């Protein structure tokens, strides 16, 4: 699947110091190992309501990581999927009377346009779940052959043959120190897992499962649902978690550096994906797990069901500048839960004007200290609010000085804010 095209990233003198990142699985901030190439997988959208502010905040967060690595002079291999076949997509297509393929493509196109507008660097590989099915089928067959997946008999009108992952058996297969067991990524207890599993697409009460938390690997064909050839699995379509695992294992090293996504993906999605990966390869999926906070609206949870989604495309259609939208997102630390408000968006627009005005008075020799301060903040768990505060201080001092601008420093500050924060002045 074709991705959008990234804009060029300015090169700056010097480089990013040692990057430290909060690792969800470890529960603390850790050094991200220095190496000549870093790799990242960020879970993509299910294309039926793009791009709301929660989506935007998550992809902007990991765009900061991408930019920090690039500023450190390393190559970055970045993969993102798109879940272009899933129950919510099919349900929305049925409700609106639109073919699911047309709905998915229209929302993918809109998402990519929004990402380009927000200056989010494009992934090296942008892979749809549907195009990955030929790779997913043999992976599931391997899990069955290895005894960590099983078929479930039909009941209550459901057909025979759905395939599930056996979390208990999989977790006992190896006593290696890096082997996966249930809870390694999320750190949750079984009670919390069961609640979240039911809320986030799982089926804990499905008859015939060995364990309530066993996730679906392959859903055999049903009347009225799209399906694909599954070889020995029979026609059907893949479960959500196995899609990302197989895509990541095909396009990234094992283990890759960072698995990213919203905090609502910690469990079950990233937990189960880690299990699938270890069962398939005997190697952890990722070295680090990083998650962005949730975004609400005026203090309320933002959700499709509540009809209170703030869409990037609607803001753009209303004439709002994407750089201001991005700056409003960056005013919050990526791990924090926060709410989008008109007042804070107004602050972001005012900040953007202030920064641009300050460029007319950029003091000679001021850029180097600003760039160093921005780098120090971003190297500390992607502290964008700290980097913004550094620019605010520089801008206030520049305007206060009233000096004639230094062309060199104006160019350096403009490039730094673009390269490190992704905000174009």
Curated annotation (Swiss-Prot):
Looking at its record, which EC class is this enzyme? ligase
Q: Where is this motif: 'HIGH' region?
A: 45-55
Which GO-annotated molecular functions does the record name? Answer: ATP binding; cysteine-glucosaminylinositol ligase activity; cysteine-tRNA ligase activity; zinc ion binding
Report motif location: 'ERGGDP' region. 199-204
Q: Membrane spanning segments where?
A: none
Q: Name one GO biological process term.
A: cysteinyl-tRNA aminoacylation
Under what name is this protein listed?
L-cysteine:1D-myo-inositol 2-amino-2-deoxy-alpha-D-glucopyranoside ligase
Q: What lineage, starting at the top, does this entry show?
A: Bacteria, Bacillati, Actinomycetota, Actinomycetes, Micrococcales
């Amino acid at each position: 699947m074709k991705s959008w095209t990234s804009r060029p990233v300015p090169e700056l003198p010097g480089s990013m110091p040692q990057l430290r990142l909060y690792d969800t699985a470890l529960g603390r901030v850790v050094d991200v190992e220095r190496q000549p190439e870093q790799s990242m997988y960020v879970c993509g959208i299910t294309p039926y309501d793009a791009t709301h502010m929660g989506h935007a905040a998550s992809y902007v967060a990991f765009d900061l990581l991408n930019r920090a690595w690039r500023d450190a002079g390393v190559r970055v291999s970045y993969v993102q999927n798109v879940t272009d076949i899933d129950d919510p997509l099919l349900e929305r297509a049925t409700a609106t009377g639109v073919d699911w393929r047309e709905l998915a493509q229209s929302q993918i196109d809109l998402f990519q346009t929004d990402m380009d507008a927000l200056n989010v660097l494009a992934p090296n590989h942008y892979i749809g779940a549907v195009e990955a099915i030929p790779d997913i089928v043999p992976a599931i067959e391997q899990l069955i052959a290895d005894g960590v997946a099983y078929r479930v008999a039909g009941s209550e009108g459901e057909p025979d043959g759905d395939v599930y992952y056996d979390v208990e058996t999989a977790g006992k297969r190896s006593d290696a120190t890096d082997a996966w067991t249930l809870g390694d990524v999320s750190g949750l207890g079984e009670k919390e897992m069961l609640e979240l599993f039911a809320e986030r697409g799982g089926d804990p009460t499905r008859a015939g499962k060995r364990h309530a938390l066993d996730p679906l690997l392959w859903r055999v064909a049903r009347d009225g649902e799209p399906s694909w050839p599954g070889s020995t699995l029979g026609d059907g379509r893949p479960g959500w978690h196995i899609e990302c695992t197989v895509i990541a294992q095909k396009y990234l090293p094992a283990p890759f550096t960072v698995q990213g996504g919203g905090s609502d993906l910690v469990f079950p999605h990233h937990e189960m994906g880690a299990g699938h990966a270890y069962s398939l390869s005997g190697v952890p999926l990722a070295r680090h797990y990083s998650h962005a906070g949730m975004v609400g609206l005026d203090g309320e949870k933002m959700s499709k069901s509540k009809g209170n989604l703030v869409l990037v495309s609607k803001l753009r259609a209303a004439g709002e500048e994407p750089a201001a939208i991005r700056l409003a997102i960056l005013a919050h630390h990526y791990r924090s839960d926060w709410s989008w408000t008109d007042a804070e968006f107004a602050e972001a627009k005012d900040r953007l004007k202030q920064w641009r005005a300050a460029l007319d008075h950029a003091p000679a020799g001021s850029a180097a200290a600003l760039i160093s301060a921005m780098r120090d903040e971003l190297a500390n768990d992607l502290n964008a609010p700290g980097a913004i505060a550094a620019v605010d201080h520089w801008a206030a001092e520049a305007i206060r000085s009233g000096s004639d601008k230094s062309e060199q420093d104006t160019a350096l500050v403009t490039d730094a804010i673009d390269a490190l924060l992704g905000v174009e002045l």
